[in-house]
């Protein structure tokens, strides 16, 4: 009888353990199911587009990889903290077109992560350095980038596909209205020749029928040589309206030298590459492009 009691007690313990194990497995599965879909963006323009597409979608987290003041990713070197951020990402949204020239390192380390190329299928502008990557500064191409990001997110995260599609459509509607407003303002400006700070604005210029006749810095962040400076001075002097455009992310020293030599007036065009990665950034692209529109309207009269 004692043996039978011991056997029954042992069976009861084993059964309880098994049931607890099943409960633990179920809880583990539920926790796994609740794991957020983590999206990392390479830099600010991609962050702004992506938070519009994911706005209000439960279970989705968006993080911008680079710091608020990084700007364009020309010659950007990945840091240890960047790789740690990407380590937990399900998808990495990049501009593409050669902007992120560190991608070999990323794909080598994160083989399971979905790479979302915002510039897929967009016709690129070529210059002496190769493909120009500043695609987002054409509103038409920015719309194409939003569509690309949304379509690829829908593939990577089908559980939220309907929400991504709805948000993308709403944002594209706003961008289309922006495009109409900017064309109405800029298509008729009397002067079309401009001098920009670096090679950020060819897509913008193509969209709004402007001619970039010179750039102040041939290499971003590198002061022009004396001969390059003199060449730009001569080009500005040949303009009927002497204006040149700086960017808030770079030192205006070279532009100020040109202005002193030519009497040109300096204006600022913002390529929308810096800002805080917060939900408030949702309107950053549209707001900044409207400011650029007003600057050009004044400068090119």
Segments from the language model and where they lie:
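Sec-dependent N-terminal signal peptides of Gram-positive bacterial secreted proteins and lipoproteins
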Residues: 3-26
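Extracytoplasmic metal-acquisition and chelation regions
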Residues: 21-301
């Amino acid at each position: 009888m004692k043996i039978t009691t011991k056997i029954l007690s042992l069976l009861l313990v084993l059964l309880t353990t098994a049931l607890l194990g099943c409960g633990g497995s179920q809880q583990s599965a539920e926790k796994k199911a609740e794991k957020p879909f983590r999206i990392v963006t390479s830099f600010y323009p991609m962050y702004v587009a992506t938070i519009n597409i994911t706005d209000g979608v439960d279970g989705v987290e968006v993080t911008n990889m680079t710091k608020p003041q990084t700007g364009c990713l020309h010659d950007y070197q990945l840091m240890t903290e960047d790789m740690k951020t990407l380590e937990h990402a399900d998808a990495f949204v990049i501009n593409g077109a050669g902007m992120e020239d560190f991608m070999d390192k990323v794909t080598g380390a994160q083989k399971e992560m979905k790479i979302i190329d915002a510039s897929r299928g967009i016709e690129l502008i070529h210059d002496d350095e190769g493909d120009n990557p500043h695609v987002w500064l054409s509103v038409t191409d920015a719309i194409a980038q939003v569509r690309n990001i949304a379509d690829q997110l829908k593939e990577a995260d089908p559980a939220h596909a309907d929400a991504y599609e709805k948000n993308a459509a709403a944002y594209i509607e706003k961008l289309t209205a922006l495009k109409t407003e900017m064309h109405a303002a800029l298509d008729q400006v009397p002067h079309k020749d401009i001098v920009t700070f670096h090679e950020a604005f060819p897509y913008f210029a193509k969209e709004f029928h402007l001619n970039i006749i010179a750039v102040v810095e041939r290499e971003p962040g590198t002061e022009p040589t004396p001969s390059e400076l003199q060449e730009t001075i001569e080009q500005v002097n040949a303009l009927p309206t002497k204006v040149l455009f700086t960017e808030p992310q770079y030192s205006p020293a070279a532009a100020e030298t040109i202005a002193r030599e030519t009497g040109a007036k300096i204006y600022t065009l913002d390529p929308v590459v810096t800002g805080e990665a917060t939900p408030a950034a949702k309107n950053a692209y549209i707001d900044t492009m409207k400011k650029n529109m007003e600057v050009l309207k004044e400068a090119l009269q």
